[in-house]
A protein has these predicted regions:
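ATP/NTP phosphate-donor binding region
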Residues: 1-99
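C-terminal charged capping/lid subdomain of soluble metabolic enzymes
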Residues: 6, 185-187, 287-364
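Residue-level signal for inorganic ion chemistry
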Residues: 16, 41, 79, 130, ...
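Glycine-rich beta-strand-to-loop/alpha-helix junction loops that act as flexible
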Residues: 73-74, 104-106, 236, 248-249
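Non-catalytic interfacial helical region
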Residues: 87-104, 113-128
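Short glycine/serine/threonine-rich phosphate/pyrophosphate-binding segments
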Residues: 108-115, 136-137, 254-255
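A glycine/threonine-rich phosphate-anchoring loop and its flanking beta-alpha core
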Residues: 115-208
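Active-site segments that bind and position negatively charged phosphate/pyrophosphate groups
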Residues: 205-315
Length: 364
């Protein structure tokens, strides 16, 4: 299955169980990588033992010179310090602007590889080879790259489109249950914002997706990518407000991740909690139907994303939200679902947020 991402520099997303085997041959057909003298594969300590040799063998079979960097797995790796180590390693390998970086891993590896590639020598080509469901449906497509600071997630980064995306569904067979549910959270987010058709298809197939049905999984990945590609095509750098819809659930979700400690809850679980909060906020201030709230709750439950039992002080949550990238002049903005397939970005006053955060905390 191939999804074409349109734009000034269009690229393909190839989805299938055998696409990693053909990585080298595919890259020889991509203009940006066809004549690259060297490919650097960036992976992590979870993924490298499983798939690094296969990726390298495919690249070498296509007559690429191949180098590798393996970083520790986990969100803490997505840091300026690790990025600096990668830049130094790139310099040591004498990578030129005609070389390319392949990101073989989940979202952390994809973000880190995209960021370091886009900034080293003012930009070298990056190829995404996501191995997690979350990375396939979210971070590998759209061009956002970045690293975290102590003040918050993804505060330093670039917009850099990949030259190619290789989504090997074979790699999902080794994905832990927690990470599977994490990807399901982003798929659910996309369905709520996209359309009735996507949402009700996902609702009908939620149990099959949760149990990793191969055909349903491939279809869910493709639908999510098509949705995101359409949004990104309208607003590549978040300058027109259209792309803000992709942050549905993330305002509270990022605060949960930050205050609970990165890694305590998966990104998808935190986003799902943010979706529940935003839908209830929408019902209170934007006319969102309670039927939408319930339908979303049911979908998240069926996908293995129950409401979290964790909470934090409303004032602490609000302080983190004010550092959210959507905030302007200290005013927090939420993506609110007006209905399935309809949304708005709304500024919400502090006292309203605190009131609803207090109710959220009491429910735990």
């Amino acid at each position: 299955m191939i999804v074409n991402i349109p734009g000034e520099r269009p690229y393909d997303v190839r989805i299938g169980s055998d696409v990693l085997d053909g990585l080298g041959n595919y890259l020889r057909r991509v203009d940006a990588t066809a004549n690259a003298p060297r490919i650097l594969v960036l992976s992590d300590t979870n993924v490298a033992p499983l798939y690094l040799e296969e990726a390298k063998a495919s690249l070498r079979a296509a007559d690429y010179r191949v180098s590798e960097i393996v970083v520790p797995a986990g969100e803490k790796t997505k840091s300026v310090e690790v990025a600096g180590e990668i830049w130094e390693a790139m310099a040591g390998l004498k990578l030129g602007r005609d070389c390319a970086v392949v990101a073989l891993g989940g979202g952390v590896v994809g973000d880190l590889a995209g960021f370091t590639a886009s900034t080293f020598m003012r930009g070298i080509t990056v190829v995404q080879a996501p191995t997690s469901l979350l990375a396939m449906v979210d971070s590998s497509v759209g061009g956002k790259t970045g690293v975290n600071l102590s003040a918050g997630k993804n505060l330093v980064g670039t917009f850099t489109q990949p030259a190619y995306v290789c989504a090997s569904t074979k790699t999902l067979s080794t994905l832990p249950s927690r990470e599977w549910a994490c990807g399901c959270g982003e798929i659910a987010k996309s369905s709520v914002i996209d359309s009735d058709e996507f949402f009700f298809w996902l609702s009908d197939n939620a149990s099959a997706l949760a149990s990793r049905d191969r055909d349903v999984t491939a279809e869910a990945i493709a639908r999510s990518i098509v949705f995101k590609a359409d949004v990104v095509a309208q607003d590549k750098t978040e300058s027109r407000g259209v792309r803000e819809c992709l942050n549905y659930g993330h305002t509270l979700g990022h605060a949960v991740e930050s205050l609970a400690g990165y890694g305590t809850y998966s990104h998808g679980a935190a986003v799902a909690e943010g979706m529940r909060f935003a839908a209830r906020l929408g019902a209170a201030i934007a006319g969102t139907s309670i039927d939408v709230v319930r339908a979303q709750d049911n979908l998240l439950d069926e996908l293995g994303l129950p409401a979290l039992s964790w909470s934090a002080a409303p004032e602490d949550m609000l302080a983190v939200m004010k550092r959210d990238k959507k905030a302007r002049g200290g005013v927090v903005k939420f993506v609110l679902p007006l209905d399935i397939g309809q949304w708005e970005l709304r500024e919400v006053e502090d006292d309203v947020i605190l009131e609803h955060l207090a109710a959220w905390a009491r429910s735990k």
